[in-house]
Amino acid sequence: MFHRPASVRRFVTTAVALGLLSTLSTGARAGARTHEPPPRPTTVSSTAGSTTALTGYAIQSTAKVTDPAAAVSSPGYPASGWYPAGARSTVLAALLAGGKYADPFYSTNQQKIPKADFQVPWWYRSDFTVADTSARTYLDFSGVISAADVFVNGRQIARSADVAGAYTRHELDVTSLVREGANTVAFRIQPNNPNKNLTMGWIDWLEPPPDQNMGIVRDVLVRRGGPVALRDAHVITRLDVPSLATADLTVKARARNDSDAAITATVSGSVGATSFRRSVALAAHETKTVTFTPADTPGLHLTSPRVWWPAGMGGQPLYALDLSASVSETVSDTVHESFGIRDVKAPLNSDGARQYSVNGRRLLIKGGGWSPDEFLRWDSTYVEDRLRYALDLGLNTIRLEGHIEPDEFFDLADRYGILTLPGWECCNKWEGNVNGSGSGDEWTAADYPVAKASMAAEAARLRDHPSVVSFLIGSDFAPDAKIEKTYLDALKAADWPTPVVAAASDKSSPVSGSSGMKMTGPYDWIPPNYWYAKREGGATGFNSETSAGPDIPTLDTLRRMMTPAELDTLWKNPGAKQYHRSPSSVFGTLKIYDAALAGRYGAPTGLTDYVRKAQLAQYENVRAQFEAYGRGATDASKPATGVIYWMFNSGWTSLHWQLLDRYLDQGGAYFGAKKANEPLHVQYSYDDRSVVVVNNRPAAVSGLTARVTLFNTDGTQKYDKSATGLSVAGDGAHSTALTLPSSVSGLSTTYLARLVLTDSAGKEVSRNVYWLSTRPDTLDWAHTDWYYTPTTSYADLKGLGSMARVPVSATASTTAGTDGASTTTVTVRNTGSGRTPSLFTDVHLVDSKGKPVLPVQWSDNEVSLWPGESATLTVTYRTADLHGSAPRVRVSGWNTAEQTVPAA
C-alpha cells in the first residue's frame, strides 16, 4: 500500500475538458532537431482563489532517463536534451511541434513514426515559483492519458493506480511540500491503450496516432487559497414553461475546511443584482454544502428572465455567479461561474423516437459528429472557425462521441447557440462489458471508480452550460445495470439538469430505458432517394450518426495531402486501400463510392474529372439527407426528430465523413448542407416528386410563390408550373406547393429541375437546382447491411457530360472593415447566347499564388445560371488570412472554363 505524506490530501473532484496544444503546426520538416531549453517556470499567483495554469513542460522518454524520480522531480534538475511541450500536449504533439517528424497529415508519413517510442512511460516535468507559502496550495488537473505517477519537489504524491482515466479530475493538497521560490511537479505518464484504459481512441475515424494520445491534454492548475475552499459551485435553474415569465435559481457550493481547527466562514455571492451571504461553521477538515434558494433569497426568483435559445430561435444571454468564502473578513477563496436559463425536454414520441424541445418549442436536431485534432492540439481560433461553419450550414447541434472538448469549446457553443450532445465513445474499453465480441477489455473492479469519477467530473464541468442538452452514457451499446448505476449516481449527485440518454443506438438500459435514437447507418454510399424512405437510416426518428460515407475534398486539399502517385491511384483504382480513408477493413477502400460515381456520372477521365464528379455527387446526396429529414420533421406519422451527419469534420486529412476538410475548404458536401438548411427553403422530393417549402424561421410566412421548370441538358424547357399564395408555419413546418407529373413528354434521360421561391413582393428567397434522371436509382433493401444498402441500378446522369460549354463572366471587389474582416463581392453571369445553363458554378477566394484563402463564409456558392442570369455572392474572411496578398477570385464550373479575376 502506498503511504502519502500525512499532510498531503487528495480530493477527487470534477473534470475540465480535453485541452489541446496551442498550435496546429504539424512539424512539416523532418531531420535533426535542435533541443530547446525547458519552458520558463510558471509564476504562481499568491491571491486567494487564484488558479494558475502551468505554461508547459519538458518531456522525455523514461527509456532515456536513468535518474531516480526524486531527482527528476526536484528543482534544479538539468533536463537538458528534453523536448519542450505546451501546457496541453500529447507526447507526439510536442515532437511534431519541434519538427522531429515530417507532416503526418501528408501521404503515409505517419506510418514512419515508430510506435515503440510510445510504449514506455514519458516524463512531463514543469517548474513553478511561489512567492508566499502562507496560503494553501493545490494541484488541480484532469486530462491525463492514460495514467500517471505524480511527484512534487522529489516526493511522490499520487500513483498511477489513483491518477487514471482521461476524464477524472484530481485535486492534491501540496501545501506542505511547496517552498518559497522554485518548485517542480513531474508526471510519469503511462502509455495509452484505449482498449484497456478508460481514455479515448479513434475507432474507424482515422489512422490512430502512434502515441495513442498519451500525455496531459488539459491544464494543470495551481490553486491558492486560505483555510476554506469553495468547490463544486453551480446553479440549478427552473424556468416556467411555456410562459417563460419566471425562473427560480438555486445556488449550491461546497465549503471545505482544510485546516486542523474549527472555523466559521462567511460564504457570500451574487447573481446579477441579487446578493446573498451566510455564515457556515465548519469543524476541522469538514465539508458542507451551502445552498441559496428563492425561499431564503427572494431575488433568486426572477421575473422576465433572459432566456437562452438555440441559434435561430432567439438570443443567447448568459448570467454570472460570483461566490467568495471569507474567514475573519479575509478572503479565503473565490468562484466565478457562467450559466444560462433554459429548459430542455426530450421525451419519446408515439413512435419511440426522442423528440427534443427547448423552452417548450420542439425542434429538429440537425447536427454533425465532431472530431478534435488527431493529436489533441487545441487552437481556439480554429475551433471557433469550425463552429461558425456549423452555423453557416444551418446546423444547430454538435455530437461529441468521447473526445469531450475543453471548457472553451462549450463557452463558444453557449455564445453561438449551438447545442451539444457529449457522451462516451464506442468500440473500446468504455463498452467492453456490453459489446459482445467487439473491441475493448471487460471491466475489472478497478475500472468502476474510474468510470464514476469520470462521469462526476464531466457532469460537474458541463451542467451549467446551456448548450449541453443531454449526456449519452452509451454509444453503440447501452451500459449494463451496474455501469448505468455508476453513471446515474454520479449524475444525480451533480444535479445533472438535462435528459440522460442510454445510447446513441436503438438500445435500452435498465433505468434510463429506451434511448429513442437509432444507429442504422448508412456509413457508405447510398443514392439520394434512400433518405426519403421511413426505414433504416431514412428520415424517421433520431439518427445519431449517418451519411453516405466518402466526402472527397477539393482538388486544392487533395494536392496538400497526397502524393501525385497516390492521387493517380485515387481515381484509377477503386479497390486500392486508401490510407486517408479509414483503418477499418469495411471502409478501407472507395469501391462502393467509385462504382456509383462511374455508374451514375460516367467513368472519370482523370483526377480533375473525378473530383468534379465527386463534388456533384456529394452536393446532391448531402442536400437530400438534410432535405428529407427537414421535410419529415412535422409529419403526423413517424416524424424525423434528429439527424447527425457523420461526421461534421475530420481530425486529419481525410477522404470520408466530413462536411468540411482539415484546412476548412468547402466543396459539394458543404454547400449541399448549406442549401438544404437555409432558413426558408424550396426543395424537391425524390420519393413522390413533390415540391415542398420548409420554413426554418420562427415566424410563419405567407404570400409565397413556388415555380418549377424542367429542362433538357441542352437547356430546352420542357415543363413549367407555379403555385401561388403559399403559406407555411414556422419552426420547421413545411407546405407542399405542387407535385410534378410522373412523366413529361420529350424530357431527356438526364434533365435539370430549377426551383425558385419568391415572396409576396416578387423577391427571390430560395433557389434550388437538381440534376435528375428518368431512370431512378434502385435500392436493394433486402440486402441491407449495417453500413449501407446496395444499389442494383443507378440513375443515369451521364447526360451532364454532353452539356455544351458556356461562358461565365465574373467581376469582384473587396471592402476591408475596421474589425479585421474583409468582404469580397462577386457577380457571376452566364453570358452564353444559347439555352444551356452554367451548372454548378464554383467561386473560390484565392491569393496571388492561387492558394485558397481560408476560412471563408459565402452567402451562396456552386450556383447554376441560365443564359442572361447572374448571381451576386459575398464572402467574408479575416483580412490577415490574405497575408498581404491582393484577393483574387477563381471561378470554375461543370461546363465552364476556369478563370481567375482580381478582387481588390
From Swiss-Prot:
Keywords annotated in UniProt: Carbohydrate metabolism, Chitin degradation, Glycosidase, Hydrolase, Polysaccharide degradation, Secreted, Signal
pH dependence comment: Optimum pH is 5.3.
Catalytic residue positions: D476 (proton donor), E545 (nucleophile)
Region (Disordered): 28-49, 813-833
Bias (Low complexity) ranges: 813-828
GO aspect biological process, one term: chitin catabolic process
Signal peptide location: 1-32
E.C. number(s) listed in UniProt: 3.2.1.165
Cellular compartment(s): Secreted
Gene3D superfamilies: Galactose-binding domain-like, Glycosidases, Immunoglobulins
SUPFAM superfamilies xref list: (Trans)glycosidases (SSF51445), beta-Galactosidase/glucuronidase domain (SSF49303), Galactose-binding domain-like (SSF49785)
A UniProt-annotated Pfam family: Ig_GlcNase
Summary of subunit composition and partner proteins: Monomer.
Protein name per the record: Exo-beta-D-glucosaminidase
Organism: Streptomyces avermitilis (strain ATCC 31267 / DSM 46492 / JCM 5070 / NBRC 14893 / NCIMB 12804 / NRRL 8165 / MA-4680)
